[in-house]
Amino acid sequence: MKKLTLLICFILISAIIDARQVEQYTIFELELKGPSAGNPFTDVQLSAEFRLMNRSIFCEGFYDGDGIYRIRFMPDQTGEWTYSTKSNIPQLDSKKGSIKCTNPSAGNHGPVKIRNTFDFGYADETPFYPVGTTCYAWVHQPEELVNQTLATIGNTAFNKIRMTVMPKNYDVYINNEPPFYPFEGSKEKGWDFFRPNPDFFRNFERRILELQKIGVEADVILFHPYDFGKWNLDKMNSEEASLYLSYLIARISSFRNVWWSMANEYDIMRKTDEEWEKYFRVIQTYDPYGHLCSIHNGMAWYNHSKPWITHLSIQTAYLQDIQDWRELYKKPVVIDECVYEGNIPNDWGNLTAEEMVNRFWISYCRGAYCTHGETYIHRENILWWSKGGKLYGKSPERIAFLHRIMTEAPAEGVYPLHNQWNKETQLIKDREWYLYYYGNSQQAMARIMLPKELKFRLEVIDAWNMTITPVAGEFSGRTEIPLPGRPYVAVRAKVINEN
C-alpha cells in the first residue's frame, strides 16, 4: 500500500506543474507547510487570489495530509499572473508570487463549454462532439484492471466517461472493496466525514489526469444511491456532504477535463430539493472555472431550467421527445443512459448492438448526444459498465463511425427538423447540408426535398456496416434515390459549391 501511495504521488507530481511558468489550461500548484494538529480539514481556512490585469480568480486550498496544504490554479489566459494567499493561520497567510502563463501546447484545447446553445466546444472554440461511455467504478479496481480500462478506452472514439467518486455496490456485478476509502474510520467504527482520506482523493485525481492524457473528459458523479448498506458512505448529513464537495472541488476543479454530475438517479436518494440546491450552490461557490454541471434522473425529472444546470443529462429510451426538451430548456441534451448493450437479465442491460447504435444515431439526428454502456455476462463479473476492463460488444466501432460523421458536419448552423412521430429523423443546415436517418425501417427508396435552385451530391450511409456510398449524379428539388431495403441507413446531401 505504501508503494502504491508513493507511485500515485510521483504521477501526480509529474502531471501537476509546480513551477513559475505553466501553459494555459494546465495546473499551477502552490505547496505550503502548515499545522497538522487538531482537524486541519475544518480548522484551517486557506485560499488564494490570482490576478491578471483587472481579472481576479479565487481558489480554495485544501489539506493533503502530513502538514501539507495545496492551492491549485488553472490559468485560462496567457500573461503574468500574480497571487496572494489568505488564511486564518499566519504561517499560510499572505504568501505572494507570480506565474507566467504561456500558450497551450498541441492537443490542449482547454475545458469543454457550451457552444451555440445546444452544442459543446472547447475553450479555444474547437467543437466537441461527445460520444460517451459509462464505467462507474473503474477507479476503484485493482491496478491491473484500471490500466486495462485506460488502454481499452484509449483505443476507442469515446471522449467522455461517466464515473463515480464513491465505490459502488450493485448485486453480483460490483461489490469489491476499493483500494482506498474516502474518509477516516470504517463502517464498523463509523466514518469521520469531516476527515477526508487524501490517499483516496489522490488516487481518484490521478485517474482523471490519465484520462486527460488520452483526450477523455471525466463526467464525475458526486453522489449515487448504490451503497445499500455495504459501507454507509452515503450517510453524510448536509453539512458533511458540503465539506466533501468543497474538498473535492478544491482538489480537481483545476483539471480541465472535469464535468460535474451532481448525482446518478438523484430521485432515488433521500435528499430534498433544498439539499440538492444547496449542493449546487457549493459547486458554484467553490468552482471558479464554471465546469459543465448537470444531474442524472431515475424516474423523476429535475428542473433543468435552473441556472446551475448547463446541460440535460437524461436517462430515457423515449428519444422522440428530444426536440421538445431542446426547445423547452434551450440547453444541450445528452442521453446519458438509454439502456446498455449486453445480455444480463436486468431490463436495462440487454440491448442488441444494433439498437445501441440506432439510439446513438436517433439522438444525434434529433439534436442530442448519446452515451454508451456495456453489460455482457462475464465469468468473473467484470462488466464494462461497472468495473471497466475490455469491451466485447459490436457498437463501439460503429459509434466511432458516427463520430466521424459528426466531425464532417458543418460546425455552425446545424439543427434538427422537429419530426416527432416518424421514424425518419433529419439534421440539417439550410441550403448546405442534410442528414436523413431512417432508423429500423427497411424502405427501398428515399424521397427527399432539396432546394430547387441548388445542386447537391448525395451519399448513402450504412450505419451498421460503416460504409459511405456516393450516388451518381447531381440532385435538386424533389429527389428519389434507391436504398438497400435494410435498417440503419442514412442519406447525406452536400451542396455543390460552384466557386
Where are the language model's segments positioned?
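Catalytic-core region of carbohydrate-active enzymes that cleave or remodel glycosidic bonds
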Residues: G290, K306-E380
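Aromatic- and carboxylate-lined catalytic core of secreted/periplasmic carbohydrate-active enzymes
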Residues: P40, G342-N343, M356-A472, E480-N499
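Extended acidic/polar, glycine-enriched regions
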Residues: E49, R55-T117
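Sec-dependent N-terminal signal peptides
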Residues: L4-I13
